[in-house]
Amino acid sequence: KKSKSSFKPKIVPQNTNTEFLDGANKAYEMIVQAYQSNNIENVKDLLTPEALNAMVQAKAPKEIKFSEVKNSSILEDREEDSRLIKSVKFETEHYNVANNEILTVVEDWGFEKEKNTSDPNWKLFSIKLVS
């Protein structure tokens, strides 16, 4: 049963979180690869209009290439007004082709989705570089 009160914590079955993280990892890879190849419009359905605009204006460094997601975990899972929000910590590896180094990058990505929508996709709305 769904609680109508926004004050009660929502208990999410573990398999739902696993499924969400699998999708979030795929979205991360798709978004980063599209960004690095200056084709961010190809993944616009995975971004809020604000996130899309920010990524269109920013240019990815040519010497840094995405390698893999090493680890991901849900940091936050909340409801806010008519939205569901999940914050995911990504630990990833990128390759610096200029100096032949592997870089470890830690970022927190915020995904959102309208509560009462038939669209199963979550949209990226924020990125915070941790390290």
Enumerate the language-model features and the residues they cover.
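Core segments of small alpha/beta cavity-forming domains
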Residues: S3-K65
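Short, solvent-exposed beta-strand/turn "edge" segments of beta-rich domains on protein surfaces
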Residues: T18-L21, E79, A98-N99
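Generic detector of leucine side chains in alpha-helical contexts
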Residues: L21, L46-L47, L52, L75, ...
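Generic signature of intrinsically disordered, low-complexity segments enriched in small/polar residues
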Residues: G23, I31, N38, V69, ...
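Intracellular C-terminal tails of type I single-pass membrane proteins
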Residues: N42-D45, A58, S72, G110, ...
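A short linear-motif detector with a strong N-terminal bias
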Residues: L46, A51-M55, I64-V69, S87-E91, ...
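A short, amphipathic edge element
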Residues: A60-E79
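Exposed beta-sheet edge and beta->alpha loop/turn motif
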Residues: D81-S131
